[in-house]
Amino acid sequence: MSNKAWGGRFQSEPEAWVDAFNASINFDHLLIDEDIQGSIAHATMLAQQGILTEDESNTIIKGLQEIQQDYHDGKIEFTEALEDIHLNIEHELIERIGAVGGKLHTGRSRNDQVATDLHLYTKKAVKEIIHLIHTLQETIVKLADDHVDTIMPGYTHLQRAQPISFAHHVMTYFWMLERDKNRFEDALKRIDINPLGAAALSGTTHPIDRAKTQELLDFAALYENSLDAVSDRDFVVETLNDISLVMIHLSRFSEEIIFWSSDEAKFITLSDSFSTGSSIMPQKKNPDMAELIRGKTGRTTGHLMSMLMTLKGLPLAYNKDMQEDKEGLFDAVHTVTGSLRIFEGMLASLTVNTDRLNETVHQDFSNATELADYLVEKDVPFREAHAIVGQIVYWCIQHDCYLLDVPLEKYQEFSSSIDDTIYSYLKPENCLKRRKSYGSTGQESVRHQIKVAKDLL
């Protein structure tokens, strides 16, 4: 007979390399706290239901707590031969307290056990992610608050388009992150459900109380169907999806940080603490943290795709394929939490080069739309105004100047509707002041936007 926990019907042991292929302890050891938390709740409930005696339950719980402490103190090493965190803990428990440790698994399967662990882990991880998003949002709002009057070129197609407020630009990412935060908060409704007691797939004949373990583990609800309880990994997919979106938003912001900090732009200066150098080029200051966040976005999206493909053809209920749910989730959580911390520190410590931004916005044609609007206010049809401004811009390019440099006589050759008020009208700071529509880049609108954001925080 095999010595495995499931070895009664087997006449030989697997080869060591088969054990290694089958094992998940190399990564699911991260679930030790959740596994012991779930087991303590299960043991407590078994005693309450008279399935275990109080002494048996107390002995089991004390043993579990000692294993947990010894593991974190580095006194225990788990083994691949015992496959996973569940059987490693059970084996260690029986070694310590004897046969009574084997009673812990009464009315429970590894199927509902691992599902419980994963729900607990994901719930904790999502709450941490929400907190980190909130912290980053606070930093964005502070940065925006300091730069409502800082003007920069806004871009479309990476071409300068219209003058905007620096605050308005960075606040865009506040709202992206707000949607991310809302998605995670909504996902908690589907994460915060107790699968414990579903056993392998069909429930158990033992008189367990699933509501009690729900209470002890602080879950908001119970699975209504035991098959669904052990088969469901929607909450993992949803969490990976939400992580992927956060990372995509951080990646987009990182791309802008990289461009803004370049010698070509010089819009911002990154702190030395969040930059690195070159091993051969002494002058280099590289935005490696932003580049790494941009690069790591691919791996989180990859984990999402991997999980979807793992699930797409699985019959009910549990299948060993589902062991593949953990590494991607663990890595995605580690990646997004690290990225949020790094990005917040990078953003909090950067310097906005306001003079450079102001200089840049005075040396482009981003006020061309203003000239068209000016003509429209003079009762010139917009399409005609658009064509006139296009001709003026072409003339400026040919003569190496900008709209504020064009002599009035030349303006009036293009349109008699233009008078000397055009020069004040085209100043970038006045372009912003005239933007008064809700949600626009005008200072009044941006200050209102920041107030709304502060109220949300």
UniProtKB/Swiss-Prot annotation:
Gene3D superfamilies linked: Fumarase/aspartase (C-terminal domain), Fumarase/aspartase (Central domain), Fumarase/aspartase (N-terminal domain)
The protein's Enzyme Commission number: 4.3.2.1
Primary location group: cytoplasm
Entry annotated with the keyword Amino-acid biosynthesis: yes
Gene Ontology biological process: arginine biosynthetic process via ornithine; L-arginine biosynthetic process
Record GO cellular component, one term: cytosol
Pathway stated in the Swiss-Prot or TrEMBL entry: Amino-acid biosynthesis; L-arginine biosynthesis; L-arginine from L-ornithine and carbamoyl phosphate: step 3/3
Family under the similarity heading: Belongs to the lyase 1 family. Argininosuccinate lyase subfamily.
Protein name, entry field: Argininosuccinate lyase
Highest classification ranks of the organism: Bacteria, Bacillati, Bacillota, Bacilli, Bacillales
Gene: argH
